[in-house]
Amino acid sequence: MSTQSVIAVKQFSGPDKIAQAYTVPQPSAHVLSNANYDYDLCGSTNSTSLSCAIQSSNIKTESISSSSLPKILPFSTDSNGESSLSRMSQAEFSDPILSSSSTFCTSLYTSSPMNSGSCRKTGYLPFLPQPPKCEQQQNSVGQSSSSLMLLDADLRNSGHADDEHTDDLKDFLNLSSDCSFHGKCSAMAYNEQMEFQFLSEQLGIAISNNEESPRLDDIYDRPPQLMSLPVSSCSDQEDLQDARSPAKVQLSSSRSSSGTASCNKPRLRWTPELHERFVDAVNKLEGPEKATPKGVLKLMKVEGLTIYHIKSHLQKYRLAKYLPETKEDKKQEEKKTKSVANGNDHAKKKSAQMAEALRMQMEVQKQLHEQLEVQRQLQLRIEEHARYLQKILEEQQKARESISSMTSTTEGESPEFAPMEKTEDKAETSSAPLSKCRITDTDAECHSKVDNKKTKPQADLEMVHDE
């Protein structure tokens, strides 16, 4: 179980030195039980601490002001994904205190001698603050050699307590089993790595190669080789080679290989023989619809053939089987559309022919109507001419009656004029048949003209009907 705790930094001001105390979170599965004690980096004075202080008298301790204290940032996040800020407490003491249990200089990342009794009492580990900048590294070369000698003596004398302490340190920092301190100037790299870790906890982004979430290395365009960073004191390489063989401390940057690894499927070439065996197996399983990849694989019994190959090939086989049917359906639909189009064209032609016939019929009817109109006009003229002739005949008849009456009166009055009247009557009678003959001739001519006019429209009608 991971517990959330507060890291406190105590500042002990003195004339030349400053003491710091840290409270760090409990490890998850170890015996670090007392959570309320402070691990005093510059512990109580005793004989061993005085001797250690005498040996390390040449070390130049840097005075740290309250403004230049290392930034203490949390390592544990709450349920909402937001990192809990650590609170820093400062306490000033008038007397300077020498470091006995674990001297922690600002330019070093090594732990000095630790009392086993105090370690068992407190049960806490030191916290690694931010390293100094590269400008301070050059001034700390003289300090590194003496601190390395102290580190060697402490590691030899600590015993089982140091082993427990190093195990707890590994578990707290999530270090590998073969971690130790290597002498190489990597303060800037470590500082950047810690900043990336804190940013990742604040933003909820893991510094990992997981495919689901982006990496901070990718966001800030950092090379992926920063997974392991050596943490050591800034010392000369020659002194480190003389002291002991170096081993790198690899910080766990939470590179999880939990991403889904794509399984490399071996490619298979479907030869005609293999396809024939596949088709036989599918036919035995009552067609591609009812065939299953597992059953086809059992029936084929081919080495190197997997169910993934069968699945893909069966899907392609089904698609290829349905494609010709769809092509035939398309051809039938095209034929139907062509037949429908032909039928429509034939109907259009028929309708055009009918329209043309109706138009011709309308023209013929129009011509007949004109001919009938001409015949009616002729008939009216004939009737007028007949009335005119009738009037002439009536006038002639009246004239005859008047003449006959006049002759009868004259005969009774003067018999002398009787032969003359007779001769006049004879002349009149002789002229009367001549006029009658003339009238009959004119009537005959009129009737013949009317008959000719009547026969012409009848002949035209007969010609139209014949057409």
Swiss-Prot record:
Keywords assigned by UniProt, alphabetized: DNA-binding, Nucleus, Transcription, Transcription regulation
Pfam family, one: Myb_CC_LHEQLE
PROSITE patterns named among the record's database cross-references: HTH_MYB (PS51294)
Molecular function per GO: DNA binding; DNA-binding transcription factor activity
Endoplasmic reticulum recorded as keyword: no
Main localization (coarse): nucleus
Compositionally skewed regions (Basic and acidic residues) per UniProt: 327-337, 419-428, 438-467
Keyword flag Flavoprotein: no
UniProt DNA-binding residue ranges: 293-318
Localization (cell): Nucleus
HTH myb-type domain sequence ranges: 262-322
Chain's role: Transcription factor involved in phosphate starvation signaling. Binds to P1BS, an imperfect palindromic sequence 5'-GNATATNC-3', to promote the expression of inorganic phosphate (Pi) starvation-responsive genes. Functionally redundant with PHR1 and PHR2 in regulating Pi starvation response and Pi homeostasis.
Protein name: Protein PHOSPHATE STARVATION RESPONSE 3
